A protein has these predicted regions:
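Residues embedded in well-ordered beta-strands
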Residues: 113-117, 139, 185
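Glycine-rich, charged/polar anion/phosphate-binding loops
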Residues: 98-104, 121-126, 151-155, 169-174
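Residue-level recognition of short, solvent-exposed, well-ordered loop/turn junctions
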Residues: 94, 109-111, 219, 236-237
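N-terminal accessory regions of nucleic-acid-interacting proteins
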Residues: 123-138
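Catalytic-pocket segment enriched in acidic/His residues
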Residues: 5, 10, 40-50, 54, ...
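Extended, compositionally biased flexible segments
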Residues: 2-103
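Short Gly/Pro-enriched turn/cap motifs at secondary-structure boundaries
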Residues: 104-108, 160-163
Length: 260
């Protein structure tokens, strides 16, 4: 099932999403993101809805340098183990929301990524076991980064954690198949900047989940950002940045400078 989360006068709601004529449509209401059946409703294109982040995580676990070409473009060594960091839930941004370039940073970069939502409490998993019961679904994310602060600080909490620095959405696909790898692209103002495949992960999803859950418990709803391919670059006020993976729609956000 594919679903979205959107704002209504009565509060946030979940809705079933279907593809029609190349566009995503809301076709039913869901009582929760784990529901298996939807109450039919008159179809509405998602472009007419006020979309929200479909994930409400207790934590956002991210993987750095998980594509060989990205590690090389930044002049970094290829990690021998997954390189983990966090983004705070307060950094979440809805599809269509505005990424704010903080005054504290002179360079803010985009990083398009595949994101995985955890579906079942996970602790000390094995990469050899069937991990599908622990996966709720997949969505898109943009790991926005204050690149100058990342280099200056040495650790990444501030550079990755500003408000609006984690756009997520627009939909979740609970049956998304990662077996053969999927193509991820990022465009800025319509110009292709990133093109990669999850088949090129240095650490595949089973290895990531085993490594992460050896250290911490993942709760239902937690978000895992799996890394970004080569091509990252700066954003300036007025830009529009779009992350796409076939089947997951388009995650588009605009950019503005902090004004207060």
């Amino acid at each position: 099932m594919k679903y979205c989360r959107f704002a209504t006068p009565e509060g946030p709601k979940y809705g079933e999403v279907t593809h029609r004529a190349g566009e995503l449509w809301l076709t039913g209401f869901l009582p929760s993101p784990t529901s298996n059946s939807a109450e039919p409703c008159p179809p509405h294109p998602l472009s007419e809805l006020s979309l929200l982040s479909p994930a409400i995580p207790s934590k956002i676990v991210c993987v750095g340098r998980n594509y060989l070409d990205h590690a090389k473009e930044l002049g970094n060594e290829v990690p021998s183990e997954p390189l983990l960091f966090f983004k705070p839930p307060s950094s979440l941004l809805a599809p269509g929301g505005v990424i704010v370039r903080p005054k504290a940073s002179a360079r803010v970069d985009f990083e398009g990524e595949l994101a995985v939502i955890i579906g079942k409490r996970a602790r000390k998993l094995s990469a050899a076991e069937d991990l599908r019961p622990y996966l709720h679904g997949c969505t898109l994310a943009n790991d926005v980064t204050a690149r100058d602060l990342q280099k200056k600080d040495g650790q990444w909490t501030r550079a990755k954690g500003f408000d609006t620095f984690c756009p997520v959405g627009p939909i979740v696909d609970t049956a998304f198949d990662l077996t053969d790898g999927v193509t991820l692209e990022t465009r800025v103002n319509g110009e292709l900047r990133q093109h990669g495949s999850t088949a090129d992960f240095i650490f595949a999803l089973p290895a990531l989940l085993a490594y992460i859950t050896a250290a911490m418990t993942l709760e239902p709803g937690d978000l895992l950002l799996t890394g970004t391919p080569a091509g990252v670059g700066p954003l300036v006020a007025g830009d529009s940045v779009t992350v796409t993976i076939p089947g997951l729609g388009e995650l588009t956000n605009t950019v503005a400078d902090e004004n207060s």
